[in-house]
């Protein structure tokens, strides 16, 4: 067979690769551009991986010959992680010597010259050593502690905190059903609750006197003692609620009871509310002859009043004083007299009969209902304190309240007579810190009643030691919803707390229950109590009628306030 070779065929050419010759060692003489600026580190596949935190590195105990039996692989630190301190938060410390006051200079000068033993600078019982150091023996240490009142307190400084008393004594036959702590209650929310619908309106209102808006510190006005009856009737004793309960609603209460529950997370003092469940209906009541209707003073302060009951600055006496100031102020700022115009609602005052000839406070009662969802209809009695006629002739309903100053030095507050005219915001901010719960209750009551304005009066003692005479230093007005936003009061959370308690009681059997705020813990407890509780021992309650207690403090003539 003959082979023919095609000389015209094209074959791929072979190009010799460039082989670099390194005369001084091994490896390439030049690096490609892709590998420039890359640090070199000997690497072996047997090396343990770890960059940020290498707990697997072996330790070498031979300190003298550390490179002995060592391998170059896995020892490089080109890719090691180093934690760098952030110096942006670094601050220099001022090490300059503090200049001592003149009375402290050289007070150890004589000790450096003293000798051990009895001398001019050494007293009996003192051990004076060299270098100016003086120590007491154990006997004198105990004597010194006794004089200072130290004693054995095991690290406690100052007197122990005073434990608050409960509003009602828990009895052995009460069964605890539920405990609700404040952190859980604060997270509750029930949004989109519409404005309440009026069912009935009762009472007569007097018009507000605008001259009180011009009062200031330099033009103060004495607080008068108004002899008028103020009714604080509980839910089941209200004849209108009894009538409405037959046709409308399944949860019944008053605005004061609702405000106490809705603002419970801001309260520190103990309080209690009695709840009766009859079928599918719930009635919320306050106990008779209790301090439920008294206004607290400095309840949320860092240092609340803790004086004994004999002092005029005790918590109870301050609450009585604040309650009377509030009642007198709300009636004094109105235009009184037979010749003055009055605003009359559809029905008369339900708590007085037609044949009674008594002077009743200016109060308008508005019975409203709210739809809370899940077939829960709330019916409550709300109150207005006065009315104001606008230039257009339309009435504006007012909720009139009073803040009182008792002793700014003891209350850690600000001097109203110095700051009220120039820095009213600072005065109000201080009151929001000291009386957060009370102001929140007033705001909730104004929102529930549908008041157009919330009038706040500033009333102070003429003399800090005299709790029976007061002067009006100024007034201020707010819109309830705007003021609620200003004091960080969420109505959605308030409705959520109320709905939570209603749902909890609805799940129980028919009977009587009690909600109580723990006096020393941020907890609300629900108890199942016997049906005859508080029925037979009201007269033996031990506290007596609050009206009698008021007269002992103020000694008002012909005072018949029903509280």
Curated annotation (Swiss-Prot):
Residues 291-305 are annotated as: RNA gate. It is found in: Cytoplasm. Residues 98-167 are annotated as: Disordered. Its main location: cytoplasm. One of its GO terms (molecular function) is mRNA cap binding. It comes from the Eukaryota. GO terms for biological process: cap-dependent translational initiation; formation of cytoplasmic translation initiation complex; regulation of translational initiation. Keywords: Cytoplasm, Initiation factor, Phosphoprotein, Protein biosynthesis, RNA-binding. Component of the eukaryotic translation initiation factor 3 (eIF-3) complex. The eIF-3 complex interacts with pix. mRNA cap-binding component of the eukaryotic translation initiation factor 3 (eIF-3) complex, which is involved in protein synthesis of a specialized repertoire of mRNAs and, together with other initiation factors, stimulates binding of mRNA and methionyl-tRNAi to the 40S ribosome. The eIF-3 complex specifically targets and initiates translation of a subset of mRNAs involved in cell proliferation. In the eIF-3 complex, eif3d specifically recognizes and binds the 7-methylguanosine cap of a subset of mRNAs. PANTHER family: EUKARYOTIC TRANSLATION INITIATION FACTOR 3 SUBUNIT 7 (PTHR12399), EUKARYOTIC TRANSLATION INITIATION FACTOR 3 SUBUNIT D (PTHR12399:SF0). The RNA gate region regulates mRNA cap recognition to prevent promiscuous mRNA-binding before assembly of eif3d into the full eukaryotic translation initiation factor 3 (eIF-3) complex. Belongs to the eIF-3 subunit D family. This is Eukaryotic translation initiation factor 3 subunit D-1. It comes from Drosophila grimshawi (Hawaiian fruit fly).
């Amino acid at each position: 067979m003959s082979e023919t070779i095609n000389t015209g065929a094209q074959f791929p050419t072979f190009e010799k690769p460039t082989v670099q010759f390194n005369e001084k060692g091994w490896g390439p003489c030049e690096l490609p551009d892709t590998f420039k600026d890359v640090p070199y580190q000997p690497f072996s596949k047997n090396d343990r991986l770890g960059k940020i935190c290498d707990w697997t590195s072996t330790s070498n105990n031979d300190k003298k010959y550390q490179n002995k039996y060592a391998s170059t692989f896995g020892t490089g630190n080109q890719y090691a992680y180093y934690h760098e301190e952030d110096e942006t938060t670094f601050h220099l410390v001022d090490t300059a010597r503090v200049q001592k006051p003149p009375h402290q200079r050289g007070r150890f000068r004589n000790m450096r010259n003293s000798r051990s033993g009895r001398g001019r600078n050494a007293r009996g019982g003192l051990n004076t050593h060299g270098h100016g150091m003086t120590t007491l023996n154990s006997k004198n240490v105990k004597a010194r502690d006794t004089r200072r009142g130290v004693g054995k307190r095991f690290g406690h400084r100052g007197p122990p905190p005073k434990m608050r008393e409960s509003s009602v004594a828990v009895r052995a036959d009460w069964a605890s059903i539920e405990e609700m702590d404040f952190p859980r209650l604060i997270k509750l929310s029930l949004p989109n609750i519409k404005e309440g619908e009026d069912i009935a309106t009762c009472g007569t209102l007097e018009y507000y006197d605008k001259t009180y808006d011009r009062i200031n510190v330099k033009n103060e006005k004495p607080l008068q003692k108004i002899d008028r009856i103020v009714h604080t009737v509980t839910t089941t004793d209200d004849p209108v609620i009894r009538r409405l309960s037959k046709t409308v609603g399944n949860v019944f209460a008053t605005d004061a009871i609702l405000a106490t529950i809705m603002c419970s997370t801001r309260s520190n003092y103990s309080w209690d509310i009695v709840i009766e469940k009859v079928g599918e209906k719930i009635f919320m009541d306050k106990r008779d002859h209790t301090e439920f209707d008294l206004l607290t003073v400095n309840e949320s302060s860092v240092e609340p009043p803790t004086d004994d009951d004999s002092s005029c600055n005790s918590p109870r006496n301050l609450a009585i004083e604040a309650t009377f100031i509030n009642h007198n102020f709300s009636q004094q700022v109105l235009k009184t007299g037979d010749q003055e115009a009055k605003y009359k609602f559809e029905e008369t005052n339900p708590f007085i009969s037609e044949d009674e000839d008594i002077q009743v406070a200016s109060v308008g009662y508005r019975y409203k209902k709210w739809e809370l969802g899940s077939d829960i209809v709330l019916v409550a009695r709300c109150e207005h304190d006065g009315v104001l006629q606008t230039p257009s002739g339309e009435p504006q309903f007012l909720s009139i309240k009073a803040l009182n100053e008792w002793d700014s030095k003891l209350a850690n507050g600000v001097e109203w007579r110095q700051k009220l005219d120039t820095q009213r915001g600072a005065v109000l901010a201080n009151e929001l810190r000291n009386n957060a719960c009370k102001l929140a209750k007033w705001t909730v009551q104004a929102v529930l009643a549908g008041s157009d304005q919330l009038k706040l009066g500033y009333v102070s003692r003429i003399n800090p030691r005299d709790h029976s005479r007061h002067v009006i230093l100024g007034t201020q007005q707010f819109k309830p919803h705007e003021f609620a936003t200003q004091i960080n009061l969420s109505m959605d959370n308030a409705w959520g707390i109320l709905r939570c308690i209603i749902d909890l009681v609805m799940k129980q059997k028919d009977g009587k229950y009690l909600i109580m705020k723990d006096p020393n813990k941020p907890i609300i407890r629900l108890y199942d109590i016997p049906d005859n509780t508080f029925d037979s021992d009201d007269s033996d309650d031990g506290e007596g009628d609050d009206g009698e207690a008021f007269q002992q403090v103020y000694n008002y003539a012909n005072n018949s306030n029903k509280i």
